[in-house]
Amino acid sequence: DDALSGIGLVQLMEKMGLAFTGADSKFFDPSRQEMKVYAKKANVPAPSWAMVDRVEDVERAAKKLRYPVLVKPPHGYASVGITRKSRCENLEQLKEQVALEINQFGRALLEEFIEGREFTCLIAENPDDPNSPVTFKPVEFIFPEGESFKHYDMKWVEYEKMSVAPVNDKRIEKTLREQTARMFKTMDGNGYARCD
């Protein structure tokens, strides 16, 4: 990794007073745990979850969740740390994946996996009216047979097998735009972002 990328670059540009596009350092990289808390505060539905710091805590945490359970790193970008095996069907698989996440990232987020469609909606700050951020037409990720979520290989290695389509169902589009705007405002969002 480049030593001057991501949050470090944003912080440097802020310190130097340079203009840049995108989020400021307070909004640039919220943890998955922070996003779960904000989702609840914004009344945006999200899967049940638990954060664990030790493999010994997995069994207790898993009792509050329904399988399958998805294991993710505490921070998220580019599906790093998420593999096909991140979707766990039982406690044995869950402990194995959590051990890998904790070894690599220090903690692990466990969340109930919801079988279904996957969408993303882009949003940008509105300089004329901060209370009305601008949402863009949502898109749906369409997975090939045998795949049920976007993991690192699906996103970066086998991306040609996945397709993206605009959301044409007006009801779904409206819901996605409204939920994205609520999250952005609740998080005091700025610049631009996306909500999956």
Regions found by a protein language model. Give the residues of each.
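Conserved metal-phosphate-binding beta-hairpin within the catalytic cores
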Residues: 112, 123, 184-196
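Generic secondary-structure signature for well-ordered alpha-helical cores
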Residues: 44, 103-106, 143, 185-189
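A short, GP-enriched loop/loop-strand-helix hinge that lies immediately N-terminal to
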Residues: 1-31, 45-48
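Peripheral (often C-terminal) accessory segments that flank ATP-dependent C-N-forming ligase machineries
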Residues: 59, 166-167, 174, 186-189
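Phosphate-binding site of ATP-dependent enzymes
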Residues: 90-178
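Active-site nucleotide/adenylate-binding loops and adjacent lid/helix of ATP-dependent enzymes
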Residues: 25-111, 115-117, 128
